[in-house]
Amino acid sequence: ITGTYLRLSRLLIAIVTYFLTPTFLLLMEYPQWIPKGFEFIAVRDTVYIPLIWQLLLLELAIDGLKLAAVNTPNMLSTPLSVMAALVLGEFSVKSGWFNSEVMLYMAFVAVANYTQNSLELGYALKFMRIINLVLTAIFGVWGYVGGIVILAVSLLFNRTVSSRSYLYPLVPFHGKQLGHQLFRTRLPAARK
């Protein structure tokens, strides 16, 4: 049960990580689309820097903090990176560079990237998210939809090392294999 829960939560977090910031940007451009009861997600403070630039700068800043943590001696890396993130985050919100909502969503995305199995998968999601952000900022709804289409086409037509689609076992559909991918099963008992 625990293994299945972790697999499903990892998949859900990957999906949320991809959609969170582009959807937020789209809803800030079209605030009338924010569902009732979710008005709290709207940016209330004055926006000095356009939201797209805030999101892109924070994507870059998060990578800068990761690189700084990698190049810092082990004993100092965790406390130093936490302190840097707190101080820089607090200063950037108080000075008006970034809005607190943007900082919150990007903090979630940054932490959620560590839930993926591999570093490459985390960066693949990041690059596709950035493409979707830029397309949404330029073309609005059509850019948002276009970013999703680009992701779907990339997943469908790029091949893994085993020459299967990244969407396998969904495309082509293989029900038993899909069950194994989503739900962790017990290993067969050792034969005597």
What are these model-derived regions, one by one?
Residues 1-51, 121, 162-189:
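Cytosolic regulatory modules rich in charged/polar residues
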Residues 13-29, 45-120, 124-125, 130-136:
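Transmembrane alpha-helix detector for multi-pass membrane proteins
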Residues 100-102, 107-192:
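Hydrophobic alpha-helical transmembrane segments of membrane transport and translocation systems
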